[in-house]
């Protein structure tokens, strides 16, 4: 394998055996591709904004004399970039400008004569833009639009599984679901009549809809039934025979023909009888007259001579009717063929219960059902029915819906109209009747072929269309109002409804979520999440077990592990690693094609529907060198079942072992040894890990760490290869390789790094360079690490030396005992950044003022404020400190004589304002790292605001001029090269000032042209610099766009350093979570024979019952990795020659049975080997991919190579007594995470505070500054102890005895510690509740 210079710094040893056929795809593509589709101009008009515009325009006036046509659209440039939007609290969006054409036709002239055309660009609101990382910045906060898994449009056949009716009869139904429009349901009732519902309203007999489609009873029967024809010959009744129809019936008379009896009366007709009849080609048989009684006629029979209706279609025949028919000359009678087995009389029965008999009465019936209480007119009824399913404005199946619809009805073509046709409705009814007759199967709703993904682009497009439809109505009104000659397109379009619809979707839709930004993994997972909830989806309460369950079609599409615990389990899922959506929005997953028993590297993406037709082998099937399966019988999946197939039956093979799981689960090493429930917790808890101060790569990983870190966008990644020309904490400059440059550019890439900014979860985002000056980099190399990344690999926690043993009860019930060394080394120290804002408003009594001149406050309290009343940067503040001094005008009050005197002496100011500072919340302390002041346009800026502005301007100028210098240097080096090659002497050239170089002329014409081009570029560069500087200056100095009534906003950022402490929650990656019980001195911790103490002691009882053995294997492998690191460290300390180092490291990389990774250190230079060794000192990082990881034997070999016991257990000594523990203990390195459930955020106490209005008890919870609940069980405890006075105090004065607590307060102030309990308020509430039931209950004094 070829490694780039950067990748050679630290190579992760990979234990994977299966070859990597397909690289992990870009993990955010589901978001980015979908939004790209929405924004991109699509000439076909199938997707995105283009589709929305084309579906609504052209808009015609009611009279048809004018229309507004759509021509094209363009998106402008956003005003602020992403960072500026976040700081200012605005939305990152671009203006949408649409070119519209107003066409006015001549009124009197013939159709289509144009009188006037006006074209104009119209502003249609702002469209939020997606950042490069798949997020949106809405009002300054980063949000993610989660994809939705909803029922695909199309037709579904289902049954109630016998649950509706008490008899347990299975009732079948069919439902046509459009993309937008009314739902159409057909269903059977227990009496086997077929009914129809529209939009889940009252049901009607299904034949009503056929009558409304203009079918007569005769035509209806003709569509759904086969005929049995009887003929009257010579006063005998003959029946046309189709032998197949007789199968399974019992003969009610002798079946004979040509004198031969085929079936005797009372015998069951079998297949043998039918074969005999067919062989003898019997077409007619004679039947007794009684046989026709009860049969149903299929059409109307009229007496030709009198015109009288003898018998109507769908009437039952009787012998009298037969005689009448015979008399009136009808010798051929057609009846319906029905039987109980597979030709039920459902439609015939339904026609009987149908109260309507013609089209109009059917339409009226439908109108009454849809609009109860309105008087129906013919026109209203017709237009309502027409608009339900047959109008493109109101109904759309969409391309997906039509495809699913036609596939379900087994039609050949998959394209067609978006509205329903007569045939569509009839075919659905026919298939439903077939299913009721026992032919065909019902659909599985939870099959991923029946559920599709709606991503950002599609949802945004739908919202945009909603806005356009609102505008359409208004435009129609305007077009019909006359005076069109003076109107322009922009006078008709009001952009408000459009931007309101878009804003509502991005701001407050259930699927637009505040991004989970704890760490890079939680960002990626959030963007890859798939929710079944949301508008048009399920609701938590209604979702049953089936929907939440893992379905066979989830394989390789949706992760079976990662889903939340709790009420949302199974409704919110995560996309599998390799899954993607196809053009219709169905999830598909890649497979390797198998041709003639040979596995090829050809890759096909299959959706859940296509997959059902193939036999698919698993990724861990053994192959020989040619790609044949080794075993004769291979474990495969087919039609959702897993079983053994012979190797020549296999069609496809999985691409990778981690194809099944999501990104989160693919980061858990030895996942295959963990119980599913614990793996779920492990995957979920990795998302809650807080980035530590110094990231530490996992010693035992899965090889996915690099992909996650790079794709998450928290690192700086090289866009093009080159060499590092400049690097400092906030900027990296790369001089691009010649072959990757665009013609005529300076060839310099500048990467500005993010420093100490706040994430959505108040964690700290900070980037640090991981390249040094002069290093070569390649495209895609990581240049700077972000939060939780280490040399371009995801690093959520720390590698800790753990021992599995009980220790004095401090690890009872999953508690964790931690060594003091962990705190000393700041291993789990995290930085949290909080934003506190102070808003100065314009009140009725005058404006609030931010000032340091505050009445009645001591000097000490204001010591950290500057003269503008705002805290200094760098000040260390604690709970209750003033950050911003703000005073609010106070209404005039009646003054006492003393106050009047004071006013007269000291002037006005002192008493007409009250203070309303911004203080540090209780329990928070930290350092002020940044202050920002936003001032409304037209309000004078205070001194601090001007200082900040000046600083920002200076910084911007410095940044830009540095950029310019770098680019200039690059340009001049190229100019110099041209001049030197054109014959100018280098020494003379270097003596000339650089600005004069461009004045030189060269004789070589080609070189002179190059020189002129470079000169042009130089001028352009300077011009560009001026422009950028001016734009920056304008942005910094302009006033801010604040909410109405707001004059100023001051934002103060506090950085809080949190060390690990008892009460913090920690976890491993296998769902093994616990709370820190004690931080133990180093000298008390258990230590090994070398005197190395362990860092963490875990309880071994946490393993067997939870069945997450992965943690034990991880511990062993971590120990081996560390052992090898220790040996390398020792060799480096002894300064052994590079050859020995190279040989030892090579041995470590080669270890393992047929691993796929081939590292050849002979191609590395000595420096590269030394640098690799330096990075392996703390342990050799190892990858053990999911389901393809290290085997037990390999772990033992690695332990042996590191000179460690192969059992993985060592003898420990008690740190307090020095005695040896009685048996060896499992010790090793486990990757531990600190979760964002910190005791500092949960710790809370209250003395006095707010009360609930009704019960007068203190509120609950930290957010409300509530009290501690003294609940039912606590009361029992005091009762059991007989602590009567304590109990009384708890339930009265400390809770809700209003008078008692006031008296108590007064007593304490007076120094008298007596208490007088009274009536608790909650007792009065109880009395009132009983009275509200009409029971008068009174308390009487004795």
Curated annotation (Swiss-Prot):
Cellular component per GO, a single term: DNA-directed RNA polymerase complex
Q: What catalytic activity does the UniProt entry give for this protein?
A: RNA(n) + a ribonucleoside 5'-triphosphate = RNA(n+1) + diphosphate
Which top EC class is given? transferase
List, in alphabetical order, the Gene Ontology terms for molecular function in this entry.
DNA binding; DNA-directed RNA polymerase activity; ribonucleoside binding
- EC number(s) given by UniProt: 2.7.7.6
Give each disulfide bond as a residue pair. Answer: none
Q: Which Pfam families match?
A: RNA_pol_Rpb2_1, RNA_pol_Rpb2_2, RNA_pol_Rpb2_3, RNA_pol_Rpb2_45, RNA_pol_Rpb2_6, RNA_pol_Rpb2_7
Gene Ontology biological process: DNA-templated transcription
CDD domains membership? RNA_pol_B_RPB2
* Keywords, comma-separated and alphabetical: DNA-directed RNA polymerase, Nucleotidyltransferase, Transcription, Transferase
Q: Which PANTHER family match?
A: DNA-DIRECTED RNA POLYMERASE I SUBUNIT 2
HAMAP family in the record: RNApol_bact_RpoB
**Oligomer and partners:** The RNAP catalytic core consists of 2 alpha, 1 beta, 1 beta' and 1 omega subunit. When a sigma factor is associated with the core the holoenzyme is formed, which can initiate transcription.
Family the UniProt entry places it in = Belongs to the RNA polymerase beta chain family.
Q: What does this protein do?
A: DNA-dependent RNA polymerase catalyzes the transcription of DNA into RNA using the four ribonucleoside triphosphates as substrates.
Q: What is this protein called?
A: DNA-directed RNA polymerase subunit beta
**What gene does this protein come from?**
rpoB
């Amino acid at each position: 394998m070829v490694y780039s210079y950067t990748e050679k710094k630290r190579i992760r040893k990979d234990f994977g055996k299966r070859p990597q056929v397909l690289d992990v795809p870009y993990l955010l593509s589901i978001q980015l591709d979908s939004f790209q589709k929405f924004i991109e101009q699509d000439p076909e008009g199938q997707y995105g904004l283009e589709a929305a515009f084309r579906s609504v325009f052209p808009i015609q006036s009611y009279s048809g004399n004018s229309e507004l046509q759509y021509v094209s659209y363009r998106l402008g440039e956003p005003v602020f970039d992403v960072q500026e939007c976040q700081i200012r609290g605005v939305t990152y969006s671009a203006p949408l400008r649409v070119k519209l054409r107003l066409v006015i036709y001549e009124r009197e002239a013939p159709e289509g004569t144009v009188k006037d055309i006006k074209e104009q660009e119209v502003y249609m609101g702002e469209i939020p833009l997606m950042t490069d990382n798949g997020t949106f910045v809405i009002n300054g906060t980063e949000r993610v639009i989660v994809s939705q898994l909803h029922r695909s449009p199309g037709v579904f056949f289902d049954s109630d599984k016998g649950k509706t009716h008490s008899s347990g009869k299975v009732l079948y139904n069919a439902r046509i679901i459009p993309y937008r429009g009314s739902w159409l349901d057909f269903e059977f009732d227990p009496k086997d009549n077929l009914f129809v519902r529209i939009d889940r309203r009252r049901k009607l007999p299904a034949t009503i809809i056929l009558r409304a489609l203009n079918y007569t009873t005769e035509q209806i029967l003709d569509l759904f039934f086969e005929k049995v024809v009887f003929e009257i010959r010579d006063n005998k009744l003959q029946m046309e025979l189709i032998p197949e129809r007789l199968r399974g019936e019992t003969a009610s008379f002798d079946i004979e023909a040509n004198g031969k009896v085929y079936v005797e009366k009372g015998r069951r007709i079998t297949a043998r009888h039918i074969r005999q009849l067919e062989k003898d080609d019997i077409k007619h048989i004679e039947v007794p007259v009684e046989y026709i009684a009860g049969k149903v006629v299929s059409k109307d029979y009229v007496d030709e001579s009198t015109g009288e209706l003898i018998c109507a279609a769908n009437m039952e025949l009787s012998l009298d009717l037969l005689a009448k028919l015979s008399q009136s000359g009808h010798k051929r009678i057609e009846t319906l063929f029905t039987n109980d087995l597979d030709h039920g009389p459902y439609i015939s029965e339904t026609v009987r219960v149908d109260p309507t008999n013609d089209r109009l009465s059917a339409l009226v019936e439908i109108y009454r059902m849809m609009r109860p209480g309105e008087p129906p007119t013919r026109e209203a009824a017709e237009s309502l029915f027409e608009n339900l399913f047959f109008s493109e404005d109101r109904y759309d199946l969409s391309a997906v819906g039509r495809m699913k619809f036609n596939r379900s009805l087994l039609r050949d073509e998959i394209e067609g109209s978006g509205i329903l046709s007569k045939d569509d409705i009839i075919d659905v009814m026919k298939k439903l009747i077939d299913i009721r007759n026992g032919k065909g199967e019902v659909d599985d709703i939870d099959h991923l072929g029946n559920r599709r993904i709606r991503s950002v682009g599609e949802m945004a497009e739908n919202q945009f269309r909603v806005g356009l439809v609102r505008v359409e109505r208004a435009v129609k009104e305007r077009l019909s109002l006359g005076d069109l000659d003076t109107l322009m397109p922009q006078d008709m379009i009001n952009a408000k409804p459009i931007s309101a619809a878009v804003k509502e979707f991005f701001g407050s839709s259930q699927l637009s979520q505040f991004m989970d930004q704890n760490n890079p993994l939680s960002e990626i997972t959030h963007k890859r999440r798939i929710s079944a909830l949301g508008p048009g989806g399920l609701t938590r309460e209604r979702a049953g077990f089936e929907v939440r369950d893992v379905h066979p079609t989830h394989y390789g599409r949706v992760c079976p592990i990662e889903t939340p615990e709790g009420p949302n389990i199974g409704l919110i899922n995560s996309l599998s690693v390799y899954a993607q959506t196809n053009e219709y929005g169905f999830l598909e997953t890649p497979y390797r094609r198998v041709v003639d028993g040979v596995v090829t590297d050809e890759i096909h993406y299959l959706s859940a529907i296509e997959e059902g037709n193939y036999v698919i082998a698993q990724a861990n099937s053994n192959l020989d060198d040619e790609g044949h399966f080794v075993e004769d019988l291979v474990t495969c999946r087919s039609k959702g079942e897993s079983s053994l197939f012979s190797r020549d039956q296999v069609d496809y093979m999985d691409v990778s072992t981690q194809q099944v799981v999501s990104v989160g689960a693919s980061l858990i090493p030895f996942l295959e040894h963990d119980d599913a429930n614990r793996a779920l917790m492990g995957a979920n808890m990795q998302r809650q890990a807080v980035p530590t101060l110094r990231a530490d790569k996992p010693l035992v990983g899965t090889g996915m760490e690099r992909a996650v870190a790079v794709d998450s966008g928290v690192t700086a990644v090289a866009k093009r290869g080159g060499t590092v020309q400049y690097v400092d904490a906030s900027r990296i400059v790369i001089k691009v390789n010649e072959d990757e440059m665009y013609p005529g550019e300076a060839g310099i890439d500048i990467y500005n790094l993010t420093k100490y900014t706040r994430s959505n979860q108040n964690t700290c985002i900070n980037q640090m360079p991981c390249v040094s000056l002069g290093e070569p980099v390649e495209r895609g190399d990581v240049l700077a690490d972000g939060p939780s990344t280490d040399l371009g690999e995801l690093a959520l926690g720390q590698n800790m030396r753990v021992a599995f043993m009980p220790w004095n009860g401090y690890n009872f019930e999953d508690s964790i005992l931690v060594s003091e060394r962990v705190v000393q080394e700041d291993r789990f120290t995290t930085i949290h950044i909080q934003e506190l804002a102070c808003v100065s408003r314009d009140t009725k009594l005058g404006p609030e003022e931010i000032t340091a001149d505050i009445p009645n406050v001591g000097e000490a309290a204001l010591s950290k404020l500057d003269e503008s009343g705002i805290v200094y940067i760098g000040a260390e503040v604690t709970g209750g400190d003033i950050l911003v001094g703000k005073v609010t005008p106070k209404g005039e009050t009646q003054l006492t004589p003393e106050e009047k005197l004071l006013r007269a002496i000291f002037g006005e100011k002192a008493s007409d304002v009250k203070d309303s500072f911004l203080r540090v919340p209780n329990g928070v302390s930290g350092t002020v790292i940044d202050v920002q002041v936003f001032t409304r346009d037209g309000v004078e800026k205070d001194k601090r605001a001007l200082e900040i502005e000046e600083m920002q301007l200076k910084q911007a100028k410095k940044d830009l001029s540095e950029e310019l210098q770098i680019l200039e240097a690059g340009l001049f080096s190229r100019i110099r090269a041209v001049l030197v090659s054109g014959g100018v002497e280098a020494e003379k050239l270097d003596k000339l000032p650089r600005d004069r170089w461009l004045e030189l002329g060269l004789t070589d014409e080609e070189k002179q042209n190059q020189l002129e081009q470079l000169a042009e570029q130089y001028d352009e560069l300077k011009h560009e610099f001026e422009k950028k500087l001016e734009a920056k200056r304008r942005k910094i100095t302009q006033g801010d766009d604040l909410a109405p009534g707001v004059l100023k906003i001051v934002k103060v950022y506090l950085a809080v350093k949190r060390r690990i402490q008892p009460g913090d929650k920690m976890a491993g990656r296998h769902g093994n979570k616990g709370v820190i019980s004690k931080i133990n001195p180093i000298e008390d911790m258990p230590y090994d024979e070398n005197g190395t103490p362990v860092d963490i002691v875990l309880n071994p009882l946490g393993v067997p019952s939870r069945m997450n053995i992965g943690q034990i294997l991880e511990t062993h492998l971590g120990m081996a990795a560390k052992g090898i690191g220790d040996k390398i460290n020792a060799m480096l300390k002894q300064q052994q020659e590079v050859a020995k180092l190279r040989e030892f490291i090579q041995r470590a990389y080669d270890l393992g049975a047929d691993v796929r990774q081939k590292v050849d250190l002979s191609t590395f230079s000595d420096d590269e080997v030394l640098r690799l060794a330096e990075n392996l000192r703390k342990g050799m990082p190892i990858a053990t991919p999911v389901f393809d990881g290290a085997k037990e034997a390999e772990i033992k070999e690695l332990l042996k190579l590191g000179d460690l016991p192969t059992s993985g257990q060592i003898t420990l000594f008690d740190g307090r007594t020095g005695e040896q523990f009685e048996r060896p203990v499992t010790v090793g390195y486990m990757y531990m995470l600190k979760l964002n459930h910190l005791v500092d955020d949960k710790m809370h106490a209250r003395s006095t505070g707010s009360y609930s209005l009704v019960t007068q008890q203190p509120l609950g919870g930290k957010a409300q500054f509530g009290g501690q609940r003294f609940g039912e069980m606590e009361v029992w405890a005091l009762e059991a102890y007989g602590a009567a006075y304590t109990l009384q105090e708890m339930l009265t004065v400390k809770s809700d005895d209003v008078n008692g607590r006031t008296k108590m307060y007064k007593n304490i102030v007076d120094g008298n510690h007596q208490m007088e309990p009274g009536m608790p308020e909650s007792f009065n509430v109880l009395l009132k509740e009983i009275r509200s039931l009409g029971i008068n209950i009174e308390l009487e004094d004795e």
